[in-house]
Curated annotation (Swiss-Prot):
NCBIfam families: ilvC, PRK05479.1, PRK13403.1. The keyword Lyase does not apply. It comes from the Bacteria. It comes from Frankia casuarinae (strain DSM 45818 / CECT 9043 / HFP020203 / CcI3). This is Ketol-acid reductoisomerase (NADP(+)). Residues 2-182 form the KARI N-terminal Rossmann domain. The keyword Glycosyltransferase does not apply. GO terms for biological process: isoleucine biosynthetic process; L-valine biosynthetic process. Binds 2 magnesium ions per subunit. Mg(2+) 2 binds at residues 191, 227, 231. Residues 183-328 form the KARI C-terminal knotted domain. NADP(+) binds at residues 25-28, 51, 53, 134.
Length: 329
């Protein structure tokens, strides 16, 4: 069973004499910085001089420096920019100031898991990864609650890395809900698999295939859109709130019977075998190597595939129908 830590298991006193730098001010960066600040932590934000986020961070009362300046000052450096920017930011702005006794932290394990960043000996390396978007992390913190987080320690040079990670998690509100102990490897591999096989890749491909099947059979594209894309949120919300069984309890008997008898015909053993291949590519590093090479080469295939996706008929149909929906238009 997973170890779960709560407020009583963490102490902000661990951070009392430490300076924290949050590098980045996007979805997670702004939530981490503001929550830490409101928890009494000495925090500064690291942003390039030309970053459009500097004004926003300053308006919200935060001290803003360049990533290099923030890293030089800080005892704990949390890197919360997109994965593909980490290597450059680390090499240019963090590594020169990452001396023994400091800690390097992440919100996702990708660059450590695949060896793209190799911190020096004498440095703690940990992860605090909220299981929710930054705006939710900030909002529930202000409500006196928290979003669950994953906590991992990759390097414990000080012998106190877990306590520091838990203190950080408490500072952003994570231990109010619960901090689940994991590893960089587990977090990275499961996160990538979920994105590729289920949440993003799997879901979008399933929706498009269902839409295409109905339209090719002669059904109206607008009705196909409602049945295969629009109503997906209704079902996902039920699953989100109470699990698959609660969703099945909430739908009609006809829908439930179709679920349990036809669903396995869609997700067949062959589909699961392909899922295992995707997982193998994640575990052996093939996906990471492919993505890093694609990014380093200017993203030609990525750009092409995204552009092609935008031309799918379901996008045009959705653009026509969504203005009818006052709650989202």
């Amino acid at each position: 069973m997973v170890e779960i830590y709560y407020d009583d298991d963490a102490s902000l006193d661990v951070l009392a004499d430490r300076k924290v730098a949050v590098i980045g001010y996007g979805s997670q960066g702004h939530a981490h910085a503001l929550n830490l600040r409101d928890s009494g932590v000495d925090v500064r934000v690291g942003l390039p001089a030309d970053s459009r986020s500097r004004a926003r961070a300053e308006e919200e009362g935060l001290r803003v420096l360049t990533p290099a300046e923030a890293s030089a000052e800080a005892d704990i450096i949390m890197l919360l920019t997109p994965d593909t920017t980490h290597r450059t930011i680390y090499a240019e702005s963090i590594a020169p100031h990452l001396t023994a006794g400091k800690a390097l932290a992440f919100g996702h394990g990708f660059n450590i898991r695949y060896g793209l960043i190799e911190p020096p000996a004498g440095v703690d390396v940990f992860m605090v990864a909220p299981k929710g978007p930054g705006h939710l992390v900030r909002r529930v913190f202000e409500e006196g609650k928290g979003v669950p987080v994953l906590v991992a320690v990759e390097a414990d040079a000080s012998g106190n890395a877990l306590a520091v990670a838990l203190a950080y998690a408490k500072g952003i509100g994570g231990t109010r809900a619960g901090a689940l102990r994991t590893t960089f490897t587990e977090e990275t591999e499961t996160d990538l698999f979920g994105e590729q096989a289920v949440l993003c890749g799997g879901a979008s491909a399933l929706v498009q295939a269902g839409f295409e099947t109905l339209v090719e059979a002669g059904y109206t594209p607008e009705v196909a859109y409602f049945e295969c894309l629009h109503e997906l949120k209704l079902i996902v919300d039920l699953m989100y709130e109470g699990g698959i069984s609660q969703m099945r309890y909430s739908i009609s008997d006809t829908a439930e019977y179709g679920d349990v008898t036809r669903g396995p015909r869609v997700i067949t053993p062959a589909v699961k075998a392909e899922m295992r291949k995707i997982l193998d590519e994640i575990r052996d590093g093939a996906f990471a190597r492919e993505w890093v090479a694609e990014d380093d080469n200017g993203r030609p295939n990525f750009t092409k595939l995204v552009a092609e996706g935008k031309q799918h008929p379901i996008e045009q149909v959705g653009a026509k129908l969504r203005p009818m929906m006052s709650w989202i238009a």
